[in-house]
Amino acid sequence: MWRWWIIVIIVCIGWTIVGHTAAAQSGGGMTLYLPLVSKAPPLPPADEAGRRLQVAPGFAIRIFAENLPQRPRFMAFGPDGWLYVSLMNSGQIARLPDRNSDGRADTIEIVASDLNLPHGLEWRDGWLYVAEGDRIERLRDGDGNGSLETRELITDNIPAPVGHSSRTLHFGPDGKLYVSAGSSCNYCVEDDPRRAAILRFNPDGSIPGDNPFATDLDPRRRPVWAWGLRNSVDFLWTPGGELWADHNGSDGLGDDLPPEEIVIPVQGGAWHGWPYCYTPGVGVVSGPEVQDTRIALPAGQTCDQAVPARFTAPAHSAPLGMTLGEGTLFPPAYRQSLYVAYHGSWNTTAGNIRDCKVERILLNEVGQPIAAEPFVTGFRAPGKPCGDAATYGRPADVIFGPEGAMYISDDKGLRIYRVVPVP
């Protein structure tokens, strides 16, 4: 009898692991990859990235893919286990399979073309949802030939790609589709309420009835979930269900203002400061926002009405993609962390260059940010800004794969890197 119970327990454990693995790979809200029973691919021999880039002690970095035909931006792993990446400027999606499991992509396969500035990607129910400059589409392989030729429009209720043209999407834990759209300007009062905002749709592109402005007289306002977010290139949900977004602040106030807002606790129906206000201070912050004096506040509106950030970085750091470290190959001490890809500065003075890097933001026991430290550095040429031609690379996105390794896209060096822990 006891042998029968052992068999039942083993089967149940195996079923649980397989079930969690499939859920992680198929997409959804915030994807948290749980530990797998399969062995991770081996670490390839040291290459240019391994020799040039500095990674935190106990980790190694290698090139996963290089010589991409255009600038790689945001990434997502598909239900097939392969990495997909948007090539924004060429209007393409590339697939990077590692069929021989050696830790490097075997080839670069263009699986979709003729898209309009594709950026954010997320898989759901066998479809790849793509955030384009002025629309959301979903793609799949309808005939089994490996290309994503079947295409459906979800919504074109997205502002035109003027100014900040990247669009990012994620499905939330509520099953709704969230889309970030940046501003059309450095600082201004936007005519279109969908700009400098996070929008919220049903999966079919319709407006949820519980959106804060679902019945507004201006139909453009109906998809708005939160606003005052000048350029939130990425966002995610914490295990506790809180929505966090990053935010690229305005230029023109010197090297030190305004700080980049890295962790903004986004609240539905709320204003988050831009263009009138910003969160002061660097690091952990707790005070109200302060005014950008270049633009007058509307009558009756004050900066203490804005939702402030909880954690900031030096001005002009340019935070782009971000991800949480739970359920990865990383040692336990590195899992309770937020990882952020910084594009780095292009317009600061020589003594105040902001580095292009991947940074680790440490979270406390209740999941709140408390400190930051470099995780991957060495992309920038000494003394040169990240926008300089001598720059080796500029991180754009950071995600974890189904085997628990970290992947970093580099839209300057046209590479994807893979980071794993080492003994």
Predicted regions and their residues:
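Structural WD40 beta-propeller signal
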Residues: 78, 124, 172-174, 238, ...
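Hydrophobic core register within WD40 beta-propeller blades
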Residues: 75, 121, 169, 232-235, ...
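Residue position within the beta-strands of beta-propeller blades
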Residues: 84-86, 130, 178-180, 245-247, ...
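A detector of repeated loop/turn-to-beta-strand junctions in beta-rich toroidal repeat architectures
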Residues: 90, 105, 133, 148, ...
